């Protein structure tokens, strides 16, 4: 068989031309390409692929990169090969859908798999996705925080447009950080996103100790978001305050007031801002002055934090989700569902908002993010009150319930919800993966269930510690993570004490 020949012409305005010559079998053509965009610092640099390029060399470079990545991020589950394979899928998607080196972008709700929600950025990234990168990819973690810091001017403008002070982050953020939500009730009332951004930054600083980021925008973000909250709360009789016209993670509650999740995340935001102001006053007086900070202002944040109400049943003392959920119409939740698909496909949104049901974890989500604020009795009561009325109509819900259950000695529930979350997209549990793309936040929360639930990883007074609760049938769980710039290894065995060591 004669070898086919071809000649390649230089690119022109009309394109790249290949001329085939000779006779014989098929010709193998290898075309290499590099991509640069106008957002790159030097978009024309590095376009030459070099004469030694080949498909084989590119493939080997790709394999080498993934081998290194799996060595760093791989999870070993001994006793459940299917779960380990599914978790590798989770890690693959979380890695592939994040532009780790580009702080001008974040991660959309559907990643790169779909244009649902216009590709915009939500609180999903800050609460459900970011912790994976904090512990597994330092560069990606920093880029995600840099994106929020870079969007601070847009957040300040958004607050101004909403007749507020400081910085208010949008519900649906575009590339430049501007609000894209067209629904007045959701976009205007789901203000918890601002506290979520501050919470994520505080979490990032705790895990990484990134002083440079703190002093180059991080502290300012905490300060400006605190200033927003000082202007957002309304005075109440007796010297108290109320958070009016708000909506928590449970989007079925309608417009309410004093959502517990929002209130206590705001309290955390205010405390972080006060700590940041105190640190600037000690270590960066120039920035302290530039931000026009004062001890009086920081004291005002702490005073507001003390006044923020915690809704409770006046007779039992049990925590309430907000000021109105208990007033809604009782209903038997399974009557609204058909399998695991969302009930809003069968019941109109107006109607479902009048039922005493919740769309997704709200109080339970709060208890996984700020667990130290609640007693074991309060957590048990919250599970009794809110788990039975949750419709799990958001893909954010299954994994959060699994995480809560794993952290609070509810093994049956932990394994049941973990199964749904782990295979949500692989098995199309909710029947919308093909139509709407991958659910990145569920993938991130599934990883958190494994790390912070089953492994029980958390930060104690002296650094990382483990309080595991392995699923039945698992013989061992092993993984690596980052803490303060160093790599650590965790090993949890069913028949031995957990082991944690620095590499």
What name fits each language-model region?
Residues 89-96, 147-154, 220-232, 268, ...:
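Alpha-helical scaffold segments in carbohydrate-active enzymes
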Residues 1-116, 348-349:
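Acidic/polar, glycine-enriched structural segments that form the non-catalytic walls/loops
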Residues 88-95, 115-119, 123-134, 191-203, ...:
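Contiguous, well-ordered alpha-helical segments that form the cores/surfaces of helical PPI scaffolds
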Residues 128, 177-180, 235, 252-280, ...:
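C-terminal capping/lid segments that line or modulate ligand- or cofactor-binding pockets
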Residues 98-113, 139-199, 205, 212-214, ...:
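Helix-terminus loop motifs that line ligand-binding clefts
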Residues 119-150, 216, 278, 288-435:
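Active-site core of glycosidic bond-cleaving carbohydrate-active enzymes
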Residues 113-121, 167-216, 224-303:
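The feature captures the catalytic groove of carbohydrate-active enzymes
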């Amino acid at each position: 068989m004669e070898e086919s020949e071809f000649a390649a012409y230089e690119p022109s305005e009309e394109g790249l031309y290949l001329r085939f010559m000779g006779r014989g079998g098929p010709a193998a053509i290898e075309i290499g390409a590099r991509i640069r965009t106008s957002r790159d610092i030097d978009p024309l640099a590095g376009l030459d692929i070099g004469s030694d390029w080949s498909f084989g060399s590119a493939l080997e470079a790709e394999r080498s990169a993934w081998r290194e990545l799996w060595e760093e991020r791989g999870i070993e589950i001994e006793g459940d090969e299917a779960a380990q394979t599914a978790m590798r899928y989770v890690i693959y998607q979380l890695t592939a859908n994040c532009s780790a080196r580009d702080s001008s972008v974040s991660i959309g709700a559907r990643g790169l798999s779909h244009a649902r929600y216009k590709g915009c950025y939500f609180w999903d990234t800050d609460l459900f996705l970011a912790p994976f990168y904090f512990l597994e990819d330092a560069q990606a973690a920093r880029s995600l925080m840099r994106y929020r810091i870079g969007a601070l001017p847009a957040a300040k403008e958004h607050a101004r447009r909403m007749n507020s002070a400081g910085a208010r982050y949008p519900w649906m953020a575009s590339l430049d950080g501007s609000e894209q939500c067209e629904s007045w009730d959701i976009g205007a009332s789901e203000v918890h996103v601002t506290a979520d951004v501050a919470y994520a930054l505080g979490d990032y600083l705790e895990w990484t100790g990134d002083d440079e980021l703190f002093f180059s925008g991080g502290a300012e973000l905490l300060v400006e978001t605190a200033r927003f909250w000082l202007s957002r709360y309304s005075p109440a009789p007796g010297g108290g305050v109320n958070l009016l016209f708000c909506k928590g993670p449970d989007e079925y509650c309608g417009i309410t007031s004093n959502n517990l999740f929002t209130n206590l995340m705001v309290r955390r935001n205010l405390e972080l801002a006060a700590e940041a102001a105190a640190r600037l006053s000690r270590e960066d007086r120039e920035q302290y002055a530039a931000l026009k900070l004062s001890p009086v202002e920081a004291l005002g944040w702490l005073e507001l934090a003390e006044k923020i109400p915690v809704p409770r049943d006046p007779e039992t003392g049990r925590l309430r989700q907000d000021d109105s959920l208990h007033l809604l119409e009782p209903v038997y939740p399974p009557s609204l569902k058909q399998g695991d698909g969302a009930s809003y496909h069968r019941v109109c949104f107006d109607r479902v908002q009048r039922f005493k049901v919740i769309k997704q974890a709200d109080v339970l989500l709060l208890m996984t993010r700020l667990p130290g604020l609640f007693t074991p009795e309060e957590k048990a009561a919250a599970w009794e009150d809110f788990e039975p009325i949750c419709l799990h109509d958001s893909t954010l819900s299954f994994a959060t319930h699994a995480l809560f259950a794993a952290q609070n000695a509810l093994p049956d529930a932990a394994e049941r919800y973990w199964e749904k979350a782990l295979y949500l997209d692989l098995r199309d549990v909710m029947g919308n993966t093909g139509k709407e793309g991958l659910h990145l936040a569920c993938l991130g929360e599934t990883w958190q269930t494994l790390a912070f639930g089953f492994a029980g990883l958390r930060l104690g007074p002296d650094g990382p510690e483990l309080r595991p609760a392995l699923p039945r049938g698992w013989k061992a769980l092993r993984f690596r993570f980052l803490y303060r710039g160093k790599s650590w290894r965790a090993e949890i065995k069913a028949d031995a004490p957990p082991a944690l060591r620095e590499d």
